[in-house]
Amino acid sequence: MTGVPRVTYRVRVPVRTRVLRPRRHGRLVRRVARRKSMRGGFLPFLVPLIAAAIGAAPGIASVALQASRR
């Protein structure tokens, strides 16, 4: 793996900090979520999925090898 550039992606995950309180007659007031346009295309969306698949590959392969030996 020498000579291969390493890339680091930072992922931001929204966390709700305020608790919605019931208003009149016990109803909760919800905000309508607006769709945001995806910046950067599909690559930032696919990178974590690809990384997870690469990380899971050795485990899947070892299970397949053990199953084939039985």
From Swiss-Prot:
<feature type="propeptide">
    <location>
        <begin position="1"/>
        <end position="26"/>
    </location>
</feature>
<protein>
    <recommendedName>
        <fullName>Late L2 mu core protein</fullName>
    </recommendedName>
</protein>
<comment type="similarity">
    <text>Belongs to the adenoviridae pX family.</text>
</comment>
<dbReference type="Pfam" id="PF05829">
    <property type="entry name" value="Adeno_PX"/>
</dbReference>
<keyword id="KW-0238">DNA-binding</keyword>
<dbReference type="GO" id="GO:0003677">
    <property type="term" value="F:DNA binding"/>
</dbReference>
<comment type="function">
    <text>The role of the precursor might be to condense the viral prochromatin for encapsidation by virtue of the two basic domains.</text>
</comment>
<feature type="propeptide">
    <location>
        <begin position="42"/>
        <end position="70"/>
    </location>
</feature>
<feature type="site" description="Cleavage; by adenovirus protease">
    <location>
        <begin position="41"/>
        <end position="42"/>
    </location>
</feature>
<dbReference type="GO" id="GO:0019013">
    <property type="term" value="C:viral nucleocapsid"/>
</dbReference>
<feature type="site" description="Cleavage; by adenovirus protease">
    <location>
        <begin position="26"/>
        <end position="27"/>
    </location>
</feature>
<keyword id="KW-0946">Virion</keyword>
<keyword id="KW-0426">Late protein</keyword>
<dbReference type="InterPro" id="IPR008393">
    <property type="entry name" value="Adenovirus_late_L2_mu_core"/>
</dbReference>
